[in-house]
Amino acid sequence: MKVLGLIVEYNPFHNGHLYHLEESKKISGADFVVCVMSGNFIQRGEPAIVNKWARTKMALSAGADLVIELPLSCAMASAEYFASGAVRILNDIGIVDYICFGSEHGDVKTLDYIAQILVEEPESYKSFLKEELDNGLSYPAARESALKKYTAHSINIPQIISSSNNILGIEYLKALRRIKSSIIPLTIKRINNDYNTENITGSISSASSIRKYISTSNSTSFDDVLAMTMPKTSVDILFEEFSAGRGPVFKEDFYPVVTSLIRKMTPEQIRNFAYVSEGLENRIKSAADTAGTYEELVESICTRRYTKTRVQRILMGILMGVTSKDLDMLSRFDSPQYARILGFNSKGKQLLSQIKKKSSIPLVLKLSDFIKSCDPVLKRKLELEILATDLYVMCYKNPAFRKAGQEFTQNIIIM
């Protein structure tokens, strides 16, 4: 029995994801596929276009056997913590043989060599890094220069570490090395569209372009453009959600509530929230007082140091009330500590029986039972998860689906 692990967002599931899933199964020879998937908020600090249960259906319909949720504390974090949390889940459930990720570079040996340098930090690399930092370079620029010097320019470091999926892939490899995992890493070269391309140009287009198309087309029923770039099952599930009024959900939907919260605060109060430092509270306050849209709010806060993605994560943290104190408490743990099941099929049911025997972390099949037995830190982590969904559903078009507590009432998806 060979088990493949995939780390995904599926926002939404499209033909590129299908290619990745099928090719990953092919090159690994896997019999089963386990996905670790972000919940209702994703790594860029944005809401997913449809909820995690709908996206679980998309994954299972396309060939995944078991979907496990990546906790919010990892899902909406930097690439390093996102990757580390997801890898730990796949490692700790005790049954995964392979991890396969997409990358622009396509050569896992080169990416793993870079990961090895960054994890082991050989003395000469550290010396190069210190030299560049002393010369006034930012940490990312200093790291790039140190890697170039250490590898004697034998590989194209700038090209590799400037590509988003290469960066994430290196973080997966670093995480595997740090925990000395026996999971074998594989990569597939991404095809066609760039991760951040905003226009649909063919049968394989980026998730960003699909979300942009949905936001501007106002489609509420079957759509030929989406049918070209997404599997039919995904399109059907997407429009089932839209027709019910459970989406689409966009970051702009949060503009009124986020701005209202900030406008009621002083800069001193804003400073208490996670990752707010170095006077950023003043920029946040000023931006909230003047911005007329969510995009304007984000752009007004951004600096060279604070990227758009980082600012969006900070704003979502403010929305959810994540303080610096919370961050200190939650960061004491270097793993998610549990595996919450979102959905499975008949093959996934077989996997669950194996996980119950081999997992070093508890399986969560019923949240209401699990949360009663948690220590205070883990309970706080789950409370944030519950709150995130309670806030997410407030953006549904249909008021009938906006009730709080859906983390407790929504059933596991079984297909």
UniProtKB/Swiss-Prot annotation:
<protein>
    <recommendedName>
        <fullName>tRNA(Met) cytidine acetate ligase</fullName>
        <ecNumber>6.3.4.-</ecNumber>
    </recommendedName>
</protein>
<dbReference type="InterPro" id="IPR008513">
    <property type="entry name" value="tRNA(Met)_cyd_acetate_ligase"/>
</dbReference>
<keyword id="KW-0819">tRNA processing</keyword>
<keyword id="KW-0547">Nucleotide-binding</keyword>
<dbReference type="GO" id="GO:0016879">
    <property type="term" value="F:ligase activity, forming carbon-nitrogen bonds"/>
</dbReference>
<dbReference type="GO" id="GO:0005737">
    <property type="term" value="C:cytoplasm"/>
</dbReference>
<dbReference type="GO" id="GO:0000049">
    <property type="term" value="F:tRNA binding"/>
</dbReference>
<feature type="binding site">
    <location>
        <begin position="190"/>
        <end position="191"/>
    </location>
    <ligand>
        <name>ATP</name>
    </ligand>
</feature>
<comment type="similarity">
    <text>Belongs to the TmcAL family.</text>
</comment>
<feature type="binding site">
    <location>
        <position position="165"/>
    </location>
    <ligand>
        <name>ATP</name>
    </ligand>
</feature>
<keyword id="KW-0820">tRNA-binding</keyword>
<keyword id="KW-0436">Ligase</keyword>
<feature type="binding site">
    <location>
        <begin position="7"/>
        <end position="20"/>
    </location>
    <ligand>
        <name>ATP</name>
    </ligand>
</feature>
<keyword id="KW-0963">Cytoplasm</keyword>
<dbReference type="GO" id="GO:0005524">
    <property type="term" value="F:ATP binding"/>
</dbReference>
<keyword id="KW-0694">RNA-binding</keyword>
<feature type="binding site">
    <location>
        <position position="102"/>
    </location>
    <ligand>
        <name>ATP</name>
    </ligand>
</feature>
<dbReference type="InterPro" id="IPR014729">
    <property type="entry name" value="Rossmann-like_a/b/a_fold"/>
</dbReference>
<keyword id="KW-0067">ATP-binding</keyword>
<dbReference type="Pfam" id="PF05636">
    <property type="entry name" value="HIGH_NTase1"/>
</dbReference>
<dbReference type="GO" id="GO:0006400">
    <property type="term" value="P:tRNA modification"/>
</dbReference>
<comment type="function">
    <text>Catalyzes the formation of N(4)-acetylcytidine (ac(4)C) at the wobble position of elongator tRNA(Met), using acetate and ATP as substrates. First activates an acetate ion to form acetyladenylate (Ac-AMP) and then transfers the acetyl group to tRNA to form ac(4)C34.</text>
</comment>
